[in-house]
């Protein structure tokens, strides 16, 4: 309960006082009542300032505030299946980035350059999820931008400075906190140069966006409207320094594996030419040989690649990895649907061969882990529709035939479970 200060007069016996500073209810704007004590709005603000300062100093001064690469990878393992090499590269890069910030605040002797990260891997292999999990581990503001919506300033579409605005919003407009955040730019392969030949038509959503991103990725002071919206001359702007913001770019780069394979082949003709067998390796295996020059051939400008010195490639997920994704992580899909069914007091059970069939379907769709949820929704749609109106159902069993569509899920009722219990006794 809060008491709003009234007039200065009144009975002194009924006057309430702040238990911390001793001011009366007439001297402050608000007085908040607890069971036996009172606190005024001024003391609340003072406490908040002290807490902010403590958090800031511990974040900057304590080396323990930066998780070790082993700590980071341990948490990533709980949420993301496989991709060991990519996780190792990311954990070291993120650890070094925040260690660099702590070092910079202690002395200005050696200036350590920022190491932005490029994630390359097939669709649905966990690029976005890795970046989101990293931000959660470090506990810094995080925002995600879609490169396909970005255009050069002055054209229809989003300016690159809108990315910084989103980060500022994620930090509740705390500029200092936003300046230590992480930005993930997805679908960065879609802003590749449209062609090698210069054209009379300006490429405002391809090379133009790459050029616009250069400055904010390297470090500049961006002017951001305080509460969003369009810029106008009379408006005051918030100044956000992007020097210490970590940028992670990700993309599927469809066809990049062919560029890498072509680089490795020797071009020879005639009777003495070496006949090379078809490259049957999976996309992820080919991507391991990625070099910056391959990204230039794909259509990214050298200056843009230069701002992303850390290259991490992710592998396409095989059947076993998809089964693990379904059942093992903390927030695995199977666990999510089992929790949904628990709300109806029903146990949801999947046979091992059912999980394998779901994984096979996802591989056929070529959507990676992203396609698993839509497959699960299709399998369980009728069951989730009927279940709230059915009485006595205690368990739903999903078999391989159910996943294939040749059978309906098995419903086990309460009386059948009692029969099972009696039989086992």
Curated annotation (Swiss-Prot):
At which positions is ATP bound?
122-129
Q: Domain ClpX-type ZB, which positions?
A: 6-59
Q: Would you name any one GO CC term?
A: HslUV protease complex
Q: Which UniProt keywords apply?
A: ATP-binding, Chaperone, Metal-binding, Nucleotide-binding, Zinc
Q: What InterPro entries is this protein classified in?
A: AAA+_ATPase, ATP-dep_Clp_protease_ClpX, ATPase_AAA_core, Clp_ATPase_C, Clp_protease_ATP-bd_su_ClpX, ClpX_bact, P-loop_NTPase, Znf_CppX_C4
Q: Which Gene3D superfamilies match?
A: 1.10.8.60, ClpX chaperone, C4-type zinc finger domain (6.20.220.10), P-loop containing nucleotide triphosphate hydrolases (3.40.50.300)
Subunit-level organization = Component of the ClpX-ClpP complex. Forms a hexameric ring that, in the presence of ATP, binds to fourteen ClpP subunits assembled into a disk-like structure with a central cavity, resembling the structure of eukaryotic proteasomes.
State the name under which the record lists this protein. Answer: ATP-dependent Clp protease ATP-binding subunit ClpX
Q: Which organism is it from?
A: Rhizobium etli (strain ATCC 51251 / DSM 11541 / JCM 21823 / NBRC 15573 / CFN 42)
Q: What lineage does UniProt assign to this protein's organism?
A: Bacteria, Pseudomonadati, Pseudomonadota, Alphaproteobacteria, Hyphomicrobiales
């Amino acid at each position: 309960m809060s008491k709003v200060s009234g007039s200065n007069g009144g009975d002194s016996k009924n006057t309430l006082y702040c238990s911390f500073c001793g001011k009366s209810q007439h001297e402050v704007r608000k007085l908040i009542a607890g069971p036996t004590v009172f606190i005024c709005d001024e003391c609340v603000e003072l406490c908040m300032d002290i807490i902010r300062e403590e958090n800031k100093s511990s974040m900057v001064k304590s080396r323990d505030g930066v998780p070790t690469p082993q700590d980071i990878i341990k948490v990533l393992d709980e949420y993301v299946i496989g991709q060991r090499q990519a996780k190792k590269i990311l954990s070291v890069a993120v650890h070094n980035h925040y260690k660099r910030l702590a070092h910079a605040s202690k002395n200005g002797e050696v200036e350590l350059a920022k190491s932005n990260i490029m994630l390359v891997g097939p669709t649905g292999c966990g690029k976005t999820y890795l970046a989101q999990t990293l931000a959660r581990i470090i506990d810094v503001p995080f925002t995600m931008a879609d490169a396909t919506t970005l255009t050069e300033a002055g054209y229809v579409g989003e300016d690159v400075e809108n990315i910084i605005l989103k980060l500022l919003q994620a930090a509740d407009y705390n500029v200092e906190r936003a300046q230590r955040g992480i930005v993930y730019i997805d679908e960065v392969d879609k802003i590749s140069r449209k062609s090698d030949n210069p054209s009379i038509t300006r490429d405002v959503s391809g090379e133009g966006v790459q050029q616009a991103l250069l400055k904010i990725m390297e470090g500049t002071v961006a002017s951001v409207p305080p509460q969003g919206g369009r810029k106008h001359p009379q408006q005051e702007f918030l100044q956000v320094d992007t020097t210490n913001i970590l940028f992670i770019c990700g993309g599927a780069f469809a066809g990049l594996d062919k560029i890498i394979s072509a680089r490795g082949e020797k071009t020879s003709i005639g009777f003495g030419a070496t006949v090379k067998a078809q490259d049957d390796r999976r996309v992820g295996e080919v991507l391991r040989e990625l070099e910056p020059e391959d990204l230039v051939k794909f259509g990214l400008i050298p200056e843009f690649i230069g701002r992303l010195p850390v290259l991490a490639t992710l592998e396409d997920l095989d059947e076993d990895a998809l089964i693990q994704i379904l059942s093992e992580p903390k927030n695995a899909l199977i666990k999510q649907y089992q929790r949904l069914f628990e709300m109806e007091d029903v146990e949801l059970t999947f046979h091992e061969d059912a999980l394998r069939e779901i994984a096979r379907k996802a591989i056929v769709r070529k959507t990676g882990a992203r396609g698993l949820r839509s497959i699960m929704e299709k399998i369980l749609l009728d069951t989730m529709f009927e279940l709230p109106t059915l009485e006595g159902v205690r368990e739903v069993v999903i078999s391989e035939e159910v996943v294939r569509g040749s059978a309906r899920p098995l419903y086990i009722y309460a009386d059948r479970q009692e029969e099972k219990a009696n039989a086992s006794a």
